[in-house]
A protein has these predicted regions:
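Amphipathic coiled-coil signal-relay and dimerization helices
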Residues: 26-35
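Hydrophobic, helix-rich cores of sensory/ligand-binding and other regulatory modules
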Residues: 1-24, 39-170
Length: 170
């Protein structure tokens, strides 16, 4: 099981938020995002949908537009670790879409930026530290995503493997 220091270190790397969810649905938040800016708190249907996704998977990476999330099964207890949201492109458009979709009413809503490769590597590390399980990039995408989203994921992956780097505005 991962400790709080490790999780705070992951937050430093991804600039995102981490939530520990126990079997009874209790949520322990680690990070600085306010509840009124957290899609998992403002949209309970979204949280329930995420918790019911692919229950057999030990890790589940999913996205809306260019905003990424991850769900990792907790070892030894029933529950999940949720990470995200982080946006993988520069600009305000993804944040505005997420705010509208998940009923976030903060006037100047912004999402943290994290390069896709960095986010995926951090989630692979989280999975390994929590469960001892190793995965490769191709095992991270979710087959439940629509075909165009899967294609977009693999195009970004190929671009990164060829040495492409996204600009980090922070």
């Amino acid at each position: 099981m991962v400790d709080e220091f490790f999780l705070k270190s992951l937050i430093q790397i991804t600039h995102g938020e981490i939530r520990l969810i126990d079997k009874d649905g209790g949520i322990c938040r680690i990070g600085k995002t306010k509840e009124e800016e957290d899609p998992f708190f403002t949209d309970k249907n979204f949280l329930n949908d995420v918790l019911e996704r692919r229950p057999e998977a030990s890790i589940d990476i999913f996205w809306e537009d260019d905003v990424y999330y991850a769900r990792v099964r907790r070892k030894g207890i029933q529950g999940w670790i949720l990470a995200g949201p982080v946006q993988t492109v520069v600009g305000a458009a993804p944040a505005l879409k997420i705010a509208q979709k998940h009923k976030i009413e903060v006037a100047s809503y912004r999402l943290p930026y994290c390069e896709l490769k960095t986010f995926l590597e951090a989630m692979k590390l989280l999975l390994y530290e929590e469960t001892g399980e190793k995965v490769c990039f191709s095992q991270l995408y979710t087959k439940q995503q629509p075909e165009p989203e899967q294609q977009k994921f693999f195009e970004k992956k190929r671009w990164m493997e060829k040495g492409g780097h996204l600009h980090n505005p922070y």
